[in-house]
Structure formats: structure tokens, C-alpha cells
A protein has these predicted regions:
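N-terminal low-structure segments adjacent to metalloprotease catalytic domains
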Residues: 1-140
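A residue-level signal for beta-strand positions that form part of recognition/binding surfaces
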Residues: 107-109, 161-163, 195, 244-245
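Metzincin-family zinc-dependent endopeptidase catalytic domain
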Residues: 131, 135-216
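Active-site recognition of the HExxH zinc-binding catalytic motif
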Residues: 215-234
Length: 289
């Protein structure tokens, strides 16, 4: 038999070799398959881990979900401290010399003052208050876009025609009244001099309709009250829902006609739901000069 097998192999050598090679290849393939499955499982685990980590990182970057409070436009927004009561006397601040506008009809010579007892250090100091007045009145979106008006920052002994005063809450109420029970500023002649009274609480805290943008609110406050001094005595309602609010609208209190009417039915506001967008400028889109 041994002789026959050797003869058979000698006569047909390829069959046994091929069979042996095929068997070896199958064993290698099975082993590689198991290894490949194992590698894929590890890859899947790694991929899942990376995806989970990324999702966790994404969640970590999201703000916490907190209940939203109702905005009460009649209240001061949260913010820094302000002065409840000052001394009802004033000192001059800022540098004179700022000027802007043509003044074809009206030249306003203004002085900037702060009430004794008001601490301006929390918002840049006395000069920062005066600089904001100067910059706002000189802005091309402001009143000087109309050639009828001109502003000049002068000293208190240089015959000013308008005093712009940063005033404590208590003094503001005496100067402006407190009939509607909300913090406001005003233009008044109660002292015999034309005066814009800037309520410090509003300068510090702003107003809810401006959604925390203190700079834009301060610009609005200046332009609105100076507008009264220029002769724009009447307030102006929101002309259409979604429009920019007129500068002479009482944006400190609300941007909605019906809500403003509810505060004072004798005012000009119609009883409609039109709500404007906050706007600090008389001419928000000035013509290119």
C-alpha cells in the first residue's frame, strides 16, 4: 500500500498539494475573519466612545435651561448701584469746545453738570458722562442731521441756553414729578432755566425695551430729552408694527402703543397692538453728505 500511495503521489502530485494548500488557506481565512471581526468590534467601540464624548462635550457647552421671568417694563432692570438722594446742587463736568451742526434756526449752547452726592465712578466718572453727551449730540444720526440745529458745549459762565444734569432719583422726582410711578427723565423749566434732567437710575440701569443695551439707551435718553428742548414737545406713537420707534416715543416705558396708552390715557398713543423696535436716533438712516 505504501508503494501504491507513493506511486499515486508521483503520478498525481498537484491534487494533494492543492488540497493541502486550500485547507491551509481556509484556516488562515477563518483566523483572519475572527481577527477582523474583533478589530471591527474594537473600532465600533472606539467610534461609539468618540460620538458619546462629542455629545457630552456639546451638552456641556449648552447653557443651563432656566425658567424665563416676565419682563416688567415699569421696573428698573437689574444692574449697578445708583444714588437715591443727592444734595440738589451741581458742579460742571467735561471739556468745553465740542460743536456740531449748521444752526440755521436754533443754536443750543449747553453745559454738562452732575449733582453733588452722585457717584459716577462706577460708570467711567464725570468726564465719561460729559463725553457721551458730546458724542451723541454730534452724531450724524442725531438732531444735527437737520440743518436747523447746532450744538455747542460751553462753560457755565458762557451764557448756556441749556443745562444737562445727571441727577439722583430723589431730585429727579422733585424736578420731573412722579405721577406715573416709574423712573423717568425729563426736560423742565421748573428752576427758570431750560434743563434736561437725566435720572441716574436710568443712566445706570437702562430700560427693558432696550434689552440690556445700555449704550443705545443712553443715546436715546439724551436725544429724546434734548428733542423736547428743541421744541418737540409732543410724544409720538409707533407708526406701524415692526417699525423703528420715533425718537419722541416714550421708549423708556414701552414700545407698544396700547401699553403706553394704559399708563396715561391722555397721551397721544392709540389703543392698538402696534409695537415698534427700539431706536435711539432722530434720523437713524441719514442721507449721505
Amino acid at each position: 500500500m505504501t508503494v501504491w500511495m507513493l506511486v499515486n503521489i508521483a503520478q498525481h502530485p498537484g491534487e494533494e498539494v492543492v488540497a493541502t494548500a486550500d485547507k491551509a488557506e481556509m484556516q488562515v481565512a477563518e483566523r483572519d475573519g475572527r481577527d477582523s471581526e474583533s478589530d471591527n468590534a474594537e473600532a465600533d467601540d472606539t467610534s461609539a466612545g468618540t460620538s458619546d464624548d462629542a455629545a457630552a462635550d456639546e451638552r456641556a457647552r449648552e447653557p443651563a435651561e432656566l425658567p424665563e421671568g416676565k419682563v416688567d417694563t415699569t421696573e428698573l432692570p437689574p444692574g449697578g448701584p445708583y444714588t437715591e438722594a443727592g444734595e440738589e446742587t451741581y458742579y460742571e463736568v467735561g471739556s468745553t469746545g465740542a460743536e456740531a451742526g449748521s444752526g440755521d434756526e436754533i443754536v443750543v449752547r449747553y453745559v454738562v453738570e452732575v449733582e453733588h452726592g452722585v457717584d459716577t465712578s462706577n460708570y467711567g466718572g464725570d468726564d465719561a458722562f460729559a463725553a457721551m453727551i458730546d458724542a451723541t449730540l454730534a452724531d450724524p444720526r442725531g438732531w444735527t442731521n437737520d440743518p436747523r440745529f447746532r450744538f455747542e458745549h460751553v462753560s457755565g459762565d458762557d451764557n448756556p441756553t441749556l443745562k444737562i444734569r445727571l441727577t439722583s432719583v430723589g431730585t429727579t422726582r422733585k424736578m420731573c414729578g412722579a405721577d406715573i410711578g416709574m423712573e423717568t427723565s425729563c426736560r423742565t423749566r421748573i428752576t427758570g432755566e431750560d434743563t434736561v434732567v437725566v435720572n441716574e437710575s436710568r443712566w445706570v440701569r437702562g430700560a427693558a425695551p432696550f434689552e440690556g443695551d445700555l449704550g443705545r439707551y443712553r443715546q436715546y435718553l439724551i436725544n429724546h430729552e434734548v428733542g423736547h428742548a428743541l421744541g418737540f414737545s409732543e410724544h409720538v406713537p409707533c407708526p406701524a408694527d415692526g417699525d423703528l420707534a420715533p425718537i419722541m416715543m416714550q421708549q423708556t416705558l414701552s414700545l407698544n402703543n396700547a401699553e403706553l396708552r394704559s399708563f396715561d390715557p391722555s397721551e397721544v398713543y392709540p389703543d392698538n397692538p402696534d409695537t415698534c423696535r427700539s431706536n435711539p436716533w432722530p434720523y437713524p438712516r441719514p442721507a449721505v453728505q
